[in-house]
Amino acid sequence: MNDYYDAVIVGAGIAGVSAARTIRELNADMSILLVNGEDRLPYKRTKVSKHIRTGYQKDEFALYPSEWYEQQGIELLSGELATDIDRQEHTVAFKGGGSVRYGKLLLSTGSEPLFPKVVRPHESDSFFVVRHAKDGERLLKSAQRAKTVLISGMGVLSVELASELSAMGKDVTLIGATAQLIPKQLNLRASEILEDLLSRKKVKLFFQEEILSFEQNKKRRMSVQMIRRSGNYDMVVICIGVQPRLELATRAGLETNRGIRVNEYLQTSDADIYCAGDAAEHPNGYVTHLWHAAEYQGVLAGKNIAGEPAKHDYPPFRLKAEVFNTYFFSVNKPWNPLDYEIEEFEEGERYWALFYKNGVLSGMVMVNDRDRAQEFERAVREGWSREQVHRTFAFA
């Protein structure tokens, strides 16, 4: 490791890797250090929850092989954590000792799981989360012995885990504070389709329910008290959401709120420090937790660091999930659908909900029309008219 790099990137998720790749594409000479806090090559994190049943090799989901980083002249520092930033000296210090100086710094530190108020993170031996590959490995190891599993959360991750664990023959109970499944990305009808699917696969669902307390009993099972029920489970999995990782930015005195505050060029309150991905809070208060949004922000940050100004223009990004071989897709589903004109179509096992604003397609939700998913995403991004949507997709 050198003493100085033109660009130091802290965090090797998709935002960090995309930034490093973009810098190199635009500038062959800039020195780049990519700090990877995990014990493996940077990987596609969204693959983990989809492969709990089958398991996975250490670098199975790697974004690029190790040789790629060498070929690109990107120095990859794995298994190391950044602990402090000295903005005046332009240095980053590491947990393992030592520090480096930077010209420009990118924080792509991502997010971390939220915990119920009754749970403290240091009690992590008592429950499971799935954020990183090691989390999935730990969960899979324990799931081999478990018979009953309680999952707290109604989002995409919770549903994917319920699908995987149920397919392993586990007795799965899914609870959450919301009144429907995946409420941020699915409309009511799509959630009903998903609910019916899970129920047919014997996944127990309890809405508007939360964990009040849990502790290990004499039989080494978890005794869980909820609002309206109680039960004993071999495993408890917490999936109630994530929050931006702010500790490094906070210690450095950068402006933070829900996330690390950035401008339209992804600069923080320090012009030489950028932030991209799950940790960034944009001028409109927007904080994303979508893979492709983080990838896009990484590209923008890379351009800006390389000296090619690029503004964030907030394009919509898709979310997809496959549950028991049923494909769910959402792009830019509105928070308040009452402000939109809505068209719904249902044909056998397929379903579409189209949201129009001033005659223009603004968002959509779809079930089991995978082959046209990319075209649907393009239609939303380009703001197709109702006539173009009907003509292209043959909606009656």
Language model features by range: what are they?
Residues 2-75, 164-185:
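Beta1-alpha1 glycine-rich phosphate/pyrophosphate-binding loop at the start
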Residues 2-5, 12, 25, 279-374:
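Mid-to-C-terminal Rossmann-like scaffold of FAD/NAD(P)H-dependent oxidoreductases
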Residues 10, 100-110, 233-241, 298:
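Short hydrophobic core segments
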Residues 62, 148, 156-213, 312-328:
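Rossmann-like dinucleotide-binding cores of NAD(P)H-dependent redox enzymes
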Residues 79-89, 207-219:
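A conserved short coil-to-beta-strand element within the FAD-binding core of flavoproteins
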Residues 109-168:
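Glycine-rich dinucleotide-binding loop and its adjacent helix/turn
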Residues 123-144, 223, 230-300:
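FAD-site-proximal beta/loop scaffold in flavoenzymes
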Residues 222, 233-255, 329-396:
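C-terminal catalytic lobe of FAD-dependent flavoproteins
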